[in-house]
């Protein structure tokens, strides 16, 4: 089956989750598998989970990994439960958008945020 979207699920958790890392990774991985299990247009490529106190995008290894996968064409849809997982502030979020827009291929962003719909960007 050929899927239109290759999804990378992203989660950024606070450093305090380090103690419960295995449970957090299992929960979020399961969330994304269930979310895209029966979606004919989307195939889950991977779940990228940062557990860190670092707010800057370049200091989050899994976010950097996700962006590299976007750049090489492995991922063309970033899905996050909330915009806050993607960037700590508006400046970082704009940097992320500019980086994605400058790529040669289209990469979309979708969140589950009910009050902050960014999936039309």
Language model regions located:
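Short, structured surface patches at the beginning of a domain
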Residues: 1-121
